[in-house]
Regions:
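Structural and coupling elements of P-loop NTPases
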Residues: 1-539
Length: 539
């Protein structure tokens, strides 16, 4: 292996640069059930952020995992919203964004990936690369996000280690460098060999133990398990050294290579190695693109963008939190910031750090940190906050829905309340709401049916609004625009029964099917139909 040390930093950095350099903001991506939420728990456990890790679908008195905090998440054992958790380890500040693994929540996940500098890809050792993992990896590749791989569940029956690495290299076109190597698999899994420093760490116990793992020399493995062929382990290591590329920090940071760790998140094994690897190799906050220029993290003036809105995190208070990724500078409690979309200033009087649904006041935060900003509808997804500069961060999109439904309210007297609730849910990004210009009932658009279940459950639990969903005459939605305002107005007038407004008041063409959409598009000269909408600079 080549040198694995992170790049050395200049000794003359400013205090701001020192703080920024301590940050590691990352997401965890995986296919559902690969162990992502369990790994999240154990990273927090190793980071000293919690005392007892929960278990997904836990029994008896074991509590639900910290990251899966919403009622529907606790009931189904899945993540449906992005949780943000901050903890410290080895004098570094980690901002962990736990994303939904289910494909129905891909939009929330995509936006989350705009807010991170690196990602951990969790792979089930028995299943290898799965469809959802591949899709999320492609998003990371588009955004040049470096990937660290954790192959999980090594203590269960699993595929051949070389097969797993070969699949990563061929399926994802990504070089692999094992940083640890499994000794045995399934019931015979004894632990991992530290490829960089030598020595075998043994799998011991389980539960909430995070003490130092026992480490022995590879020559002593035979004494622990007489059935183990130590020479076979040595042969595997020699073959891995020949077959896999040596670790190069630049190749990793550029997204060409992934360091690979093996373990069992459920049994707390391999998690410490992964966390140390994140601290050593994952980049500090990177420069962010705006419509005017690239913004460097160590610039003195604060800037940030909103990538998520979450309402009613505390059911006892109708609160609304905007999650903002700091892109540069330092945020101080009480400072004023310019909301670029409106051109108005707002006071950041009580910014907050989060730990799933728990929160604490953020007196100060630095580039790379994720803070919650309480507000009453002022902030929206994609908004940019600055200390005066008129720039807008780009790349926080909305996607056209794949399912469109009408909302039927069982109690017509609550129509106004439903309108307000849907507005709030759409601003959160839970669903998209389209209001037909001909006065017909509102339509909701989602990526998959599970989103409808979440919407129904939240409307009932948070607003006491029992609803049903009905098939709509429309199945597709496309944002429409034109360089010629008169042409756009004429198109809207001619197709009024199929025009709706989104949450921002932008016009959307609702189509019955693909054929009708294509037919209309061919005849709409000068009109652009888009299935993706990026943030706007001005309202």
């Amino acid at each position: 292996m080549s040198d694995t040390a992170a790049t050395t930093e200049s000794p003359t950095r400013s205090p701001l640069s020192e703080e920024v350099a301590r940050r590691r903001t990352f997401a965890i991506i995986s296919h559902p059930d690969a162990g992502k939420t369990t790994l999240t728990e154990k990273l927090l456990l190793f980071g000293g952020a919690i005392n007892l890790a929960g278990q997904v679908k836990a029994k008896g008195e074991r509590r639900n995992t910290r990251s899966d905090w919403m009622k529907i998440e606790r009931e189904r054992g899945i993540s449906v919203v992005t949780s943000v958790m901050t903890f410290e380890f080895n004098d570094l500040v980690f901002n962990l964004l736990d994303t939904p693994g289910h494909e129905d929540f891909s939009e929330d996940t995509y936006r989350t990936l705009t807010a991170v500098d690196s990602a951990v890809m969790v792979i089930d050792a028995a299943k290898g690369i799965e469809a959802r993992t591949r899709k999320l990896f492609e998003v990371c590749r588009l955004r040049d996000i470096p990937i660290i791989t954790f192959i999980n569940k090594m203590d269960r029956e699993s595929r051949d280690t070389f097969d797993l690495l070969d699949e990563i290299e061929k399926t994802l076109a990504l070089d692999t460098t094992p940083m640890t190597w499994p000794v045995g698999r399934g019931r015979d899994f004894l632990g991992t060999y530290d490829v960089v420093n030598g020595g075998v760490r043994l799998l011991e116990g389980g539960g909430a133990k995070t003490g130092a793992t026992e480490q022995i020399d590879i020559a002593d493995l035979g004494k622990r398990n007489p059935n183990l062929d130590v020479s076979e382990v040595r042969d595997e290591l020699a073959l891995a050294s020949e077959a896999c590329k040596p670790f190069e920090l630049a190749a990793f940071r550029e997204g060409h290579l992934t360091p690979v760790y093996f373990g069992s998140a459920l049994r707390n094994f391999g998690v410490g190695d992964l966390l140390e690897g994140l601290g050593k190799f994952a980049p500090a906050p990177r420069a962010q693109d705006s419509d005017l220029r690239r913004v460097e993290a160590a610039e003195p003036r604060m800037s940030a963008f909103v990538f998520k809105i979450q309402a009613n995190m505390d059911p006892n208070h109708r609160d609304r939190i905007a999650f903002a990724r700091l892109c540069s500078g330092k945020l101080s409690r009480g400072m004023k910031a310019k909301l670029v979309r409106t051109g108005k200033n707002m006071s950041l009087s009580s910014p907050q750090f989060f730990f799933a649904q728990d929160r604490s006041v953020a007196d100060e935060a630095f580039a790379g940190d994720v803070v919650g900003i309480p507000n009453h509808g002022t902030l929206r997804i994609g908004d940019t906050l600055t200390e005066g500069e008129d720039l807008t961060f780009v790349g926080v999109p909305s996607f056209a829905p794949e399912i469109v439904r009408r909302v039927r309210l069982t109690d017509a007297m609550k129509a106004k309340k439903l309108k307000e609730a849907l507005q709030q849910m759409s601003e959160e990004g839970v669903v998209q709401v389209f209001r037909p210009r001909d006065g017909a009932p509102a339509l909701v658009g989602v990526v998959g049916p599970l989103q409808l279940d979440v919407l129904k459950a939240r409307l009932d639990a948070e607003y006491s609004l029992p609803v049903e969903f009905e098939i709509s005459e429309f199945s597709l939605a496309r944002w429409i625009s034109s360089d010629d305002r008169k042409k756009l107005d004429a198109f809207v007038a001619a197709n009024n029964s199929g025009i709706a407004d989104d949450v921002d008041g932008d016009p959307v063409f609702m189509a019955k099917n693909e054929f009708y959409l294509g037919y209309t598009r061919e005849r709409a000269e000068g009109i652009t139909f888009s299935n993706v909408k990026d943030v706007k600079k001005k309202a």
